[in-house]
């Protein structure tokens, strides 16, 4: 989709766009993203690719709006949601509202009733203020949550008391993936509004 008389093109991600996105990351954030991290987050994801780009007429990627899709349990239905992240734009191409145009194109293209139930993210205050002003971002209500570190959960209260649970770091798991599916099947009724944590998620 061309905008501004063909000066820019809005398009979804295609194989080979990785380098341009990583170059944009370096310019926008003054740091480098490990290509393996990008591959793990966006390309090795077993679900769809949800990335919208704004590209100049000389093929430079100047805006990235996207995130990682997940299967999501919504009561009895399985739908898709996107965790927005790594949203960025080139500092020399922020005129003419191209960031807003890219974001709106993302919503038009990906956020259909058959594709996505919702988008969510964890922007900082500055970026949230931009989204609130031009994209109708909304804060969710206060959320109650529990936070604990494993070593705090399983510390011995006294020398005579033994831990009931022992923790072990597992870096590789060669067992059947269906075991993760079984755990999710047994637990999902307790999580009617939750990301599906089955084998494909793991």
Where are these regions (language model features)?
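Basic/polar N-terminal segments that are highly enriched at the extreme N-terminus
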Residues: 1-4
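Amide-forming acyltransferase catalytic core, primarily the GNAT-like/NAT-type
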Residues: 6-11, 18-58, 62-66, 79, ...
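Generic anion/oxyanion-binding catalytic loop in active/binding sites
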Residues: 10, 73, 91-92, 191
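Beta-strand-enriched cores of mature, soluble protein domains
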Residues: 13-16, 84
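A short acidic/small-residue loop/turn micro-motif
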Residues: 69-71
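Acyl-donor binding region in acyl/amide transferases
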Residues: 75-145
